[in-house]
């Protein structure tokens, strides 16, 4: 037996099947016949955007925060240790300090570092906290470590320091002279005597 519903569908009760639907109707198996409205139609790009956003979360749930994973330096240290072990580095004992001279005249100073070396591969590893210092800060104890290039830079540094001090002394002398060269604004009158 076929029943025609006013919504434009035919349903066969004996077989329990839907025999015919009209294009303007939408029938879902869980609910009764539902008619679509012209406003419920969405273009493809909007519907895919909405379905993609709903796949990740349900309605009313807060947005999921992305967890930022910070790499620890421990993993890098382990890789470095493994590479150094392959190179067969050996520890060097009784190193009090290590100084690295930069081109700008500054020095990277390591106090009591751990030093490992592999002479065949010309590799040295320093472990410790390095501080960048000026060459003048380390001058008394560093003179025996200076090579010919560093000695030349030390001479230049000393010359520039002396020139700077001469310029400062000359500038102070000029300031004193400038105070004496103040012209009188009114000829013949001295206002300083009135103040005293």
Swiss-Prot record:
Keywords: Cytoplasm, Nucleus, Protein transport, Repressor, Transcription, Transcription regulation, Transport. One of its GO terms (biological process) is protein transport. Residues 27-40 have a biased composition (Polar residues). PROSITE patterns: NAC_AB. GO terms for cellular component: cytoplasm; nucleus. Pfam families: NAC. Residues 177-196 have a biased composition (Acidic residues). Residues 74-139 form the NAC-A/B domain. Gene3D superfamilies: Nascent polypeptide-associated complex domain. This is Nascent polypeptide-associated complex subunit beta. It comes from Aspergillus oryzae (strain ATCC 42149 / RIB 40). The gene is egd1.
């Amino acid at each position: 037996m076929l029943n025609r519903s006013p919504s434009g569908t035919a349903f066969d009760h004996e077989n329990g099947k839907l025999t015919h639907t009209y294009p303007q109707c939408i029938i879902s198996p869980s609910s009764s016949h539902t008619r679509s409205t012209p406003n419920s139609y969405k273009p493809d790009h909007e519907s895919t955007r909405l379905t993609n956003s709903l796949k990740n979360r349900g309605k009313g749930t807060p947005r999921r925060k992305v967890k930022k994973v910070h790499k620890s330096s421990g993993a890098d240290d382990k890789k470095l240790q493994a590479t150094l072990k392959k190179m067969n580095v050996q520890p060097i004992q009784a190193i009090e300090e290590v100084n690295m001279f930069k081109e700008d005249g500054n020095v990277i100073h390591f106090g009591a570092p751990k030093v490992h070396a592999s002479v065949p591969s010309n590799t040295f590893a320093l472990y410790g906290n390095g501080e960048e210092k000026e060459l003048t800060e380390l001058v008394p104890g560093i003179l025996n470590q200076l090579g010919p290039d560093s000695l030349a830079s030390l001479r230049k540094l000393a010359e520039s320091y002396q020139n700077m001090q001469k310029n400062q002394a000359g500038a102070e002398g000029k300031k004193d002279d400038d105070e004496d060269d103040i012209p009188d604004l009114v000829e013949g009158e001295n206002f300083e005597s009135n103040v005293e």
